[in-house]
Amino acid sequence: MTSSLYLSTTEARSGKSLVVLGILDLILKKTTRIAYFRPIIQDPVNGKHDNNIILVLENFRLQQTYTDSFGLYFHEAVSLASDGAIDQVLDRILAKYRHLADQVDFILCEGSDYLGEESAFEFDLNTTIAKMLNCPILLLGNAMGNTIADSLQPIDMALNSYDQESCQVVGVIINRVQPELATEIQAQLEQRYGDRPMVLGTIPQDIMLKSLRLREIVSGLNAQVLSGADLLDNLVYHHLVVAMHIAHALHWLHEKNTLIITPGDRGDIILGVMQAHRSLNYPSIAGILLTADYHPEPAIMKLIEGLPDAPPLLLTSTHTHETSARLETLHPALSPTDNYKIRHSIALFQQQIDGEKLLNYLKTIRSKGITPKLFLYNLVQAATAAQRHIVLPEGEEIRILKAAASLINHGIVRLTLLGNIEAIEQTVKINHIDLDLSKVRLINPKTSPDRERYAETYYQLRKHKGVTLAMARDILTDISYFGTMMVHLGEADGMVSGSVNTTQHTVRPALQIIKTQPGFSLVSSVFFMCLEDRVLVYGDCAVNPDPNAEQLAEIALTSAATAKNFGIEPRVALLSYSSGSSGQGADVEKVRQATAIAKEREPDLALEGPIQYDAAVDSTVAAQKMPGSAVAGKATVFIFPDLNTGNNTYKAVQRETKAIAIGPILQGLNKPVNDLSRGCLVEDIINTVVITALQVK
């Protein structure tokens, strides 16, 4: 499984690029199979690519393209979210993230830039993305120009929000700290968060990293280079507007790497500053920026051009004060070619941050489970790769047709629809369903030439039960029996039905024709409960009204196998109204016996029972009621003692938590047949078809 980290910040210009460079350099010492991903990037200005993506791709020579390296533009995310289509934002991000993550050992995600006015939206979006991707978070704060309290307040608020969303945070770094405040801020971090398993660190404000190079000023101000083009890498630590007499101006010239800003017609200042630059009694300057589009006199230019060590001379068309104001709006960006700044950034990160401690936290993080978005994405990808053939008997139902449209248009499965073909075509046309019926096999069981062959097969299977061939012909006009026979004979890989028919109408033909797998005494069911931050398995909530201890044990083991097959680590809780040995009575004794049977059959499986629901999901309750249990507090598979309890519980959880419930998914059959709820939505049908495709052996 790919290791990951999500770098998130609390405000703009926190110096994320330094931390990105430091982390990737750290990880590269462990593995070369790394990737870098930005879920959201700023809209391109004049066609320019995102600077941080180019910086990373070129500096670390990663084997990924620019377009692979980001999800979507900020304006796209805002527009879709405003239209209530946040799921489209997340789906696009997830697809591109998985494309990279599936090829590497580690992926670093860098959050958005907070350059607009939607900072609250950005924070929530970054939190949602990190949670969806199951990425631990490294939180980066910005102390530039802030007091200690102002630097720590956004960190407190962010951590509180992450805690509420059950996000895992592996570190807090405060960047751009004034050196004189570094010790106190570090002490405050330790005092506030030292009891949490996190890396805590500060990175001091660095004058070189915060300073523009002259070439950035030339670009930002659209300035001309009059001389010194080979010195545009000079760093500008300060800038000074000079309009007074040169004798007075020199009094203010006491910082090195200063950019002098003066009108272009002030030849006295230009020459005086040039001489000061050469003098051992004054600091060297970064350059001279002339304003108001005034070119120096030709004689002055001739003099400057003859000086061997003259600083660069630049010219801009704006007046002096406007030029100075525009200069304040420019911010340095780490260029992919600025090797000195890149090396300095990495060295500063290594010096200030305990990288090995961060790596250890990343290694020891135990995921609570796969997130719903990731779970469903993985299922769809696997089903698409498998290209199974699924039969949908209720082909005239509008929800089935809408689901079929999505499945076909996205190339997830191959489909056969059963029903009156003219009725199917009419329903598609009247309801403007985007389904190309030429890509779907349509069969009317009542007129199909295959019905006679299917009837003969059914007759052979059921004649010992008194079924005649004439009866078989009549039975095979039923869509459920016809679809089930297609699966039995290998003419379809699986079947999904039940949107307008009962569970028995779906299950009975499967039991009669497909039958249970060897070693299975019954067919049972599970629901995949896609909660906000994890996916759980509930069984049996649909088929067996009151299983005995043997049957309950079988349901538990089958459900655990189903969970494992779908990427969920099985930790099985057999539920009852009491935990451990505290309760008595026939109901709890049945669960106790079922647990013993299941443990005997699979001793290596993490399994606990009887256990109450709260002890199964809540670590605090688990510590009190069942200390030391491998399941209590972290169960992923929940086995209910009877249908009444299971069905009501799954519906209550679904309603109260807005969870997506996928199922019921049938277990124990020789070939996959699955039932739908009659109240199912189009999305439920799609999910069940995907699951069915993946149950095919």
From Swiss-Prot:
Cell location: Cytoplasm
Database matches in InterPro entries: DRTGG (IPR010766), P-Actrans_bac (IPR016475), P-loop_NTPase (IPR027417), P_AcTrfase (IPR004614), P_AcTrfase_dom1 (IPR042113), P_AcTrfase_dom2 (IPR042112), Phos_Acetyltrans/Butyryltrans (IPR050500), PTA_PTB (IPR002505)
Ranges in a coiled coil: none
Keyword Transmembrane helix: no
Acyltransferase keyword on record: yes
GO biological process: acetyl-CoA biosynthetic process
Enzyme class: transferase
Pfam family, one: DRTGG
Gene3D superfamilies for this protein: 3.40.50.10950, HprK N-terminal domain-like, Isocitrate/Isopropylmalate dehydrogenase-like, P-loop containing nucleotide triphosphate hydrolases
EC number: 2.3.1.8
Annotated spans, Phosphate acetyltransferase: 374-697
Keywords: Acyltransferase, Cytoplasm, Transferase
Pathway(s) served: Metabolic intermediate biosynthesis; acetyl-CoA biosynthesis; acetyl-CoA from acetate: step 2/2
CDD domains from the UniProt entry: DTBS
TM ranges: none
GO CC annotation terms, alphabetical: cytoplasm
Catalytic reaction list: acetyl-CoA + phosphate = acetyl phosphate + CoA
GO MF: phosphate acetyltransferase activity
Family of this protein: In the N-terminal section; belongs to the CobB/CobQ family. In the C-terminal section; belongs to the phosphate acetyltransferase and butyryltransferase family.
UniProt function note: Involved in acetate metabolism.
Protein name per the record: Phosphate acetyltransferase
Gene: pta
